[in-house]
C-alpha cells in the first residue's frame, strides 16, 4: 500500500498539468485545440474552456457546455467570436492574432470527478517580416526575420526551400527572441528556377512555420537589367562625405575673404600714396619762399 501511494504521489493525478503542450500557429491561420473526453463520466459534468493571455494576468471563460449536450454553446460575442466550440469539444481559433497568444486549457467538472486541467496548451503565434539589403558586391539580398509571441528562444528553427535547404548564399542567425536568414543570389539557382518566385519557410516543431515569397530574380539576363534607383550604404556615405567637403571648402573661403576685407585698409594706410596736386602745391610754395636768383652783370 505504501508503494502504491508513493507511485501515485510521483506520477500525479490525471487533472495535473502533465499534458501541457506548446502549439505553434502562424499569424492569421486557424488552429484546433482538442479536449478529449475523460475516461470516466457520469453525465453531470460540465466542460469549460479557459484562456489566460500572455500579455495579461487575468483568466477568461471562453466556452462552457454540459458533456453529452447535442449542440455546444456558440460562445460569447466580442473577442471570443473567433473562438468557438466544436462538436467534439475542441476549441477552434479562427484567424489568430498576436493577442491570442497565451495559455488555454479545458476542465471537466462534476460531482464525482473533477478534471481541473484536463488539457493545457501554450499557444504561440508565429510571425515573419521581410527586408531588402545589398551585399558587399552590390547584389540584392533578402533578410527574412522569424519571431514568436510570446518571446522565446528560436534555436530549433529550420529554414527550408521546397523539401530541401535554401539555395544560394545563405547565412542564418539565432537570437533570444527571433531567427534571421540572409539570402543572396548564388550559383545554386538554376536558370529556369530563378525566373519563378521562391518560397522559403521558417519551420518550428511539427512542421509549423511562416512562409516567405521571394520575387523572381531577373539579373540572369543582361537585357532585362535596369539601373538601380535604391540608395545603399556606400552611396549614402559617399554623398555625405562629398557634402561635408563642400561645406568645409565654402567655410574656409568665407573666412579667407573676411580676413582679406578686414586687412585691406591697414595695408593702404601704411603705404604712402602719391597725390599730384599736393606735390605741385609744395613745389610752388617752396619756389616762392626761396631767395631770388642772382643775375650776373
Curated annotation (Swiss-Prot):
**Effect ascribed to mutating residue 281 to F:** No phosphorylation. No interaction with GRB2 and GRB7. No phosphorylation increase of p42/44 MAP kinase
Q: Which residues form the signal peptide?
A: 1-16
Read off the InterPro entries from this record: Ig-like_dom, Ig-like_dom_sf, Ig-like_fold, Ig_sub, Ig_V-set, LY6G6d/LY6G6f
Task: Briefly state the modifications made to the protein after translation.
Answer: N-glycosylated.
Keywords recorded for this protein, A-Z: Cell membrane, Disulfide bond, Glycoprotein, Immunoglobulin domain, Membrane, Phosphoprotein, Signal, Transmembrane, Transmembrane helix
Record topology, Cytoplasmic segments:
257-297
As for membrane topology, the entry says: Single-pass type I membrane protein
Its transmembrane ranges are 236-256
A GO cellular component annotation in the UniProt record: plasma membrane
What ranges are annotated Extracellular (topological domains)?
A: 17-235
Disulphides? 35-106
Question: Key word Manganese present in the record?
Answer: no
Question: Could you tell me which SUPFAM superfamilies the record lists for this protein?
Answer: Immunoglobulin
Query: Which residues belong to any copy of the Ig-like V-type domain?
Result: 17-122
Where would I find glycosylation on this chain?
88
Q: How does it assemble?
A: Homodimer; disulfide-linked. Interacts with GRB2 and GRB7 in a phosphorylation-dependent manner.
Briefly state the protein's biological role. May play a role in the downstream signal transduction pathways involving GRB2 and GRB7.
Designated name of the protein: Lymphocyte antigen 6 complex locus protein G6f
Amino acid at each position: 500500500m505504501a508503494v502504491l501511494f508513493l507511485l501515485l504521489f510521483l506520477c500525479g493525478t490525471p487533472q495535473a498539468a502533465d499534458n501541457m503542450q506548446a502549439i505553434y500557429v502562424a499569424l492569421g491561420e486557424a488552429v484546433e485545440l482538442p479536449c478529449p473526453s475523460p475516461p470516466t463520466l457520469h453525465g453531470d459534468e460540465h466542460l469549460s474552456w479557459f484562456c489566460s493571455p500572455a500579455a495579461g494576468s487575468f483568466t477568461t471563460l471562453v466556452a462552457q457546455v454540459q458533456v453529452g449536450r447535442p449542440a455546444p454553446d456558440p460562445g460569447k460575442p466580442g473577442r471570443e467570436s473567433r473562438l468557438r466550440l466544436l462538436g467534439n469539444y475542441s476549441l477552434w481559433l479562427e484567424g489568430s492574432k498576436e493577442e491570442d497568444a497565451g495559455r488555454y486549457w479545458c476542465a471537466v467538472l462534476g460531482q464525482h470527478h473533477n478534471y481541473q486541467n484536463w488539457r493545457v496548451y501554450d499557444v504561440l503565434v508565429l510571425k515573419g517580416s521581410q527586408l531588402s539589403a545589398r551585399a558587399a558586391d552590390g547584389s540584392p539580398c533578402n533578410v527574412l526575420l522569424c519571431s514568436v509571441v510570446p518571446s522565446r528562444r528560436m534555436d530549433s528553427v529550420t529554414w527550408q526551400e521546397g523539401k530541401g535547404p535554401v539555395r544560394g548564399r545563405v547565412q542564418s542567425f539565432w537570437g533570444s527572441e527571433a531567427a534571421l536568414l540572409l539570402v543572396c543570389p548564388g550559383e545554386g539557382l538554376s536558370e529556369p528556377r530563378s525566373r519563378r518566385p521562391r518560397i522559403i519557410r521558417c519551420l518550428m516543431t511539427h512542421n509549423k512555420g511562416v512562409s516567405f515569397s521571394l520575387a523572381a530574380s531577373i539579373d540572369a539576363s543582361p537585357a532585362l537589367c535596369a539601373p538601380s534607383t535604391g540608395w545603399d550604404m556606400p552611396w549614402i556615405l559617399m554623398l555625405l562625405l562629398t557634402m561635408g567637403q563642400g561645406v568645409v571648402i565654402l567655410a574656409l573661403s568665407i573666412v579667407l575673404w573676411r580676413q582679406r576685407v578686414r586687412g585691406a585698409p591697414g595695408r593702404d594706410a601704411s603705404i604712402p600714396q602719391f597725390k599730384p596736386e599736393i606735390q605741385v602745391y609744395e613745389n610752388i610754395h617752396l619756389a616762392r619762399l626761396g631767395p631770388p636768383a642772382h643775375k650776373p652783370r
